[in-house]
Amino acid sequence: LDGIIQDWRYWGSNYLWNAMDFLNEEFSDPKKMMEDIHGMNAHIIISIWSAFGPHTKPYRELDKGNMLFNFRTWPESGSEKWPPNMDYPSGARVYDAYHPQARDIYWKYLNENLRSVGIDGWWMDSTEPDHFHPIPEDFDTPTYLGSFRKVRNAYPLMSVGGVYDHQRAVTSDKRVFILTRSAFAGQQRYGANTWTGDITASWEVLEKQIPAGLNFSLCG
């Protein structure tokens, strides 16, 4: 075993979505957890997202600067039951990764709360970003670089690049490792690996991953 992935919910409830902090009471001593993992010569990467719940510090700071989008994203509901109960919307919103100040804020919380305790890499989920029940007006959402309609496909490039550039500026002692759900041309320069999305566990699906990966690589 070389690597372990810490999936979502280490932050607690959906209203604290992607707080970039170990707020779940099950994680009483995250630093010791990292030390124990490293003591067994393993590494850990952690799930981080493009959206923030309304009770998080990143949300409040980004909201003050008008650096959050208003379209619907994941999680849709504050309730953790399935299907989503829209009587209790989560209020989660996607951050403007095109904005340099927003990328600074995003990294600040990664660095202070996650990298500082020994996280080795980043599992960047929802880097498309997730956009549910779209309406035409959503694509007119203003970003730092123009309308969302014009720059939407480059979102993963900007979000992943922001994490890479900031980590490189902080230290060169550890290589940057990023696993991202989405990509854009040129993203390989950011030390980013891409997976083929949310799939099921079957031999048939595994078989399809091989040509998918080869074609993805050939496309650059």
Task: Give the location of each predicted region.
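Catalytic-domain carbohydrate-binding cleft regions of carbohydrate-active enzymes
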Residues: 1-220
